[in-house]
UniProtKB/Swiss-Prot annotation:
Coiled-coil intervals: none
Record remark: domains: Has three domains with a flexible linker between the domains II and III and assumes an 'L' shape. Domain III is highly mobile and contacts RuvB.
GO biological process: one example: DNA repair
Gene3D superfamilies: 5' to 3' exonuclease, C-terminal subdomain (1.10.150.20), DNA helicase RuvA subunit, C-terminal domain (1.10.8.10), Nucleic acid-binding proteins (2.40.50.140)
SMART domains linked: HhH1
Protein name in the entry: Holliday junction branch migration complex subunit RuvA
GO molecular function per UniProt: ATP binding; four-way junction DNA binding; four-way junction helicase activity
Main function: The RuvA-RuvB-RuvC complex processes Holliday junction (HJ) DNA during genetic recombination and DNA repair, while the RuvA-RuvB complex plays an important role in the rescue of blocked DNA replication forks via replication fork reversal (RFR). RuvA specifically binds to HJ cruciform DNA, conferring on it an open structure. The RuvB hexamer acts as an ATP-dependent pump, pulling dsDNA into and through the RuvAB complex. HJ branch migration allows RuvC to scan DNA until it finds its consensus sequence, where it cleaves and resolves the cruciform DNA.
Main location: cytoplasm
Quaternary data: Homotetramer. Forms an RuvA(8)-RuvB(12)-Holliday junction (HJ) complex. HJ DNA is sandwiched between 2 RuvA tetramers; dsDNA enters through RuvA and exits via RuvB. An RuvB hexamer assembles on each DNA strand where it exits the tetramer. Each RuvB hexamer is contacted by two RuvA subunits (via domain III) on 2 adjacent RuvB subunits; this complex drives branch migration. In the full resolvosome a probable DNA-RuvA(4)-RuvB(12)-RuvC(2) complex forms which resolves the HJ.
Span list, region Domain III: 151-193
Gene designation: ruvA
Length: 193
């Protein structure tokens, strides 16, 4: 297993890199979030990596942070999500944004990523619920979402309200409110809208 690579960045062509490590050039694919933070060609670079061995190829994927690599590893465990699709997900949104989308069960945000349809987005939400969101928390600058708010959101979605309507209604519910009272207050807010 190759867990990390450090060398000189020889070539950048999104999403591919060529990293010279003691005279050996390694081809590494990276998500765009990592690509945008790379140094200039000719400069030293260090990446955390994940080696994928297939029957026809050995593929090396690189990441700027441990959270990106851990998220990639969780994504490729999901049936129907290969390394390329996982890379597309990480290129489409940051890890904290993905964690928030999963915590809030926002399939609509995931379907904006090229190659992710409604069914794939729902599978991602189902498979990663409790894994990614719990591990990574919330997006900095936004309030943390308590479990009761997620339960209220899921209840409103089950009643047929859109994600946008449900999220707006939950904002009207005071923090620390229980699930049952939260649903009542959210429904009251929705009836006034």
């Amino acid at each position: 297993m190759i867990g990390r690579i450090a060398g000189t960045l020889i070539e950048k062509n999104p999403p591919h890199l060529l990293v010279d490590c003691h005279g050996v050039g390694y081809e590494v694919d990276v998500p765009m979030s990592t690509f945008y933070n790379l140094p200039a060609v000719g400069q030293p670079v260090t990446l955390l990596t994940q080696l994928i061995v297939r029957e026809d190829a050995h593929l090396l994927y690189g990441f700027g942070t441990a959270s990106e690599r851990n998220t990639f590893r969780e994504l490729i465990k999901i049936t129907g999500i290969g390394a390329r699709m996982a890379l597309a997900v990480l290129s489409g949104m940051s890890v904290p944004e993905l964690a928030q989308a999963i915590t809030l069960q926002e399939a609509g945000r995931l379907t904006r990523i090229p190659g992710i349809g409604k069914k794939t987005a729902e599978r991602l939400l189902l498979e990663l619920k409790g894994k990614l969101g719990a591990e990574l928390g919330h997006v900095p600058g936004t309030p943390a979402v308590p479990d009761s708010a997620v339960d209220v959101l899921n209840a409103l979605l089950a009643l047929g309200y859109s994600e946008k309507e449900a999220a707006a209604a939950i904002k009207q519910v005071p923090a620390g409110t229980g699930v049952s009272d939260g649903i009542k207050l959210a429904l009251k807010a929705l009836s006034k809208a």
